[in-house]
C-alpha cells in the first residue's frame, strides 16, 4: 500500500492514567485529565518530530521516539512503506513518574497512524497492539477507553471491563522532580510473593472496584491497601509512607503509589482537596524536595481523534 494517503493531517489526544490504585497490580487503571496531543502527517521523505511541553528535553526526536515506533507498527502491519512522517507533540504528562506517559505515547502513535492510513484497524486491535508494546494492559486500556478499567492481558489479547467515574472525587497527584523508570521499579519486586499477600490483594482489588462503582468512598482507605508491590518500592520513594499518613490525616479517602511511582496519588472529596494538597506538600517541602501537585479528575472520554484526514 502506498501513496494516495496524502489527504492531510490527523490529530489525536490521549489522557494520562494512574494504575494499580494500591492492590490492583497490572490490572486497574483510571484515566486522568492530563493529555498528550499528537499531530501526524505524511511528508515526502524523512522524519520530523517536534515536541512542546513536558519532557521536551527527554523525548527523542528520532526513530527511537515511542510515538514513531508505535506508528511504525501500524504502517508495517498494513503495508505502508516509503513514506516520510511529521509528528508534532504537545505533552502535559510528566515522564517517568507513574502517570502513564508511555501508555499515552503508544496509544497516541497507534491511533494516529491508524487514522492516517484509512482506519484499517478496530480500536480493539489497537488496544491489543498497545498492550503488546507496553507489556501490560492497565495504563493503555485506561488511556484508550477512559474511566475506570479492569483489564487482563492473555495470549496477546486484552479483556476488560470499564466504568465511567463521576466528578465527585479528586485525584491528587504529587509529582517529584526525580523520575523513576518503570523497569527500575519492577526490578525491586520479588520473583515470588507470599500466598497470604496474594489473597490480601485479590480481595482488596475486587472490593476496590465495587467501592468505586457504588461510591462508598469512605471504604477506599481499606480497599486501596496493598501487600504486593508498594512495600518493595518504598526504597525508591523513601517518604512514601509519610505521604500516605499525611494524606489520610488531612481527610483523603485513600493514598497510594501511582503506577510504579514515584508519584503519590491521593483520592479526596473536593471539599478536602486543598487541605490534603497542603499537608502532603509539607513532606516534600520539609525535605527541600522539588515537586508539583495536580488536582485531577477522572477522564471518561479516553483517547479522542480531533482531526481526521480528508480520505477517512
From Swiss-Prot:
Its EC number is 2.7.1.39. One of its GO terms (molecular function) is homoserine kinase activity. Pathway: Amino-acid biosynthesis; L-threonine biosynthesis; L-threonine from L-aspartate: step 4/5. ATP binds at residues 94-104. It catalyses: L-homoserine + ATP = O-phospho-L-homoserine + ADP + H(+). It is an enzyme of class 2 (transferase). Pfam families: GHMP_kinases_C, GHMP_kinases_N. InterPro entries: GHMP_kinase_C_dom, GHMP_kinase_C_sf, GHMP_kinase_N_dom, GHMP_knse_ATP-bd_CS, Homoserine_kinase, Ribosomal_Su5_D2-typ_SF, Ribsml_uS5_D2-typ_fold_subgr. The keyword Mitochondrion does not apply. The keyword Cytoplasm applies. Its main location: cytoplasm. GO terms for cellular component: cytoplasm. Keywords: Amino-acid biosynthesis, ATP-binding, Cytoplasm, Kinase, Nucleotide-binding, Threonine biosynthesis, Transferase. GO terms for biological process: threonine biosynthetic process. It is found in: Cytoplasm. Belongs to the GHMP kinase family. Homoserine kinase subfamily. Catalyzes the ATP-dependent phosphorylation of L-homoserine to L-homoserine phosphate. This is Homoserine kinase. The gene is thrB.
Amino acid at each position: 500500500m502506498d501513496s494516495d494517503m496524502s489527504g492531510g493531517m490527523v490529530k489525536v489526544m490521549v489522557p494520562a492514567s494512574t494504575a494499580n490504585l494500591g492492590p490492583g497490580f497490572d490490572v486497574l487503571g483510571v484515566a486522568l485529565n492530563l493529555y498528550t496531543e499528537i499531530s501526524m502527517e505524511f511528508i515526502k521523505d524523512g522524519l520530523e518530530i517536534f515536541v512542546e511541553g513536558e519532557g521536551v528535553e527527554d523525548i527523542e526526536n528520532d526513530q527511537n521516539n515511542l510515538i514513531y515506533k508505535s506508528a511504525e507498527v501500524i504502517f508495517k502491519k498494513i503495508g505502508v512503506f516509503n513514506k516520510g512522517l511529521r509528528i508534532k507533540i504537545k505533552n502535559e504528562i510528566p515522564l517517568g513518574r507513574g502517570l502513564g506517559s508511555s501508555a499515552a505515547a503508544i496509544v497516541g502513535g497507534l491511533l494516529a497512524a491508524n487514522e492516517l492510513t484509512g482506519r484499517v484497524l478496530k480500536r480493539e486491535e489497537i488496544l491489543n497492539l498497545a498492550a503488546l508494546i507496553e507489556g501490560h494492559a492497565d495504563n493503555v486500556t485506561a488511556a484508550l477507553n477512559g474511566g475506570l478499567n479492569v483489564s487482563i492481558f492473555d495470549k496477546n489479547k486484552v479483556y476488560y471491563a470499564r466504568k465511567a467515574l463521576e466528578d465527585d472525587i479528586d485525584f491528587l497527584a504529587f509529582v517529584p522532580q526525580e523520575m523513576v523508570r518503570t523497569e527500575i521499579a519492577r526490578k525491586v519486586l520479588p520473583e515470588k510473593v507470599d500466598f497470604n499477600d496474594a489473597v490480601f490483594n485479590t480481595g482488596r482489588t475486587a472490593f476496590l472496584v465495587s467501592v468505586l462503582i457504588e461510591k462508598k468512598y469512605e471504604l477506599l482507605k481499606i480497599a486501596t491497601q496493598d501487600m504486593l508491590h508498594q512495600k518493595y518500592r518504598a526504597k525508591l520513594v523513601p517518604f512514601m509512607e509519610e505521604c500516605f499518613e499525611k494524606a489520610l490525616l488531612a481527610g483523603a479517602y485513600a493514598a497510594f503509589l501511582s503506577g510504579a511511582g514515584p508519584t503519590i496519588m491521593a483520592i479526596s472529596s473536593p471539599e478536602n482537596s486543598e487541605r490534603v494538597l497542603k499537608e502532603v506538600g509539607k513532606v516534600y517541602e520539609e525535605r527541600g524536595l522539588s515537586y508539583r501537585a495536580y488536582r485531577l479528575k477522572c477522564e471518561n472520554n479516553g483517547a479522542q481523534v480531533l482531526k481526521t484526514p480528508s480520505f477517512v
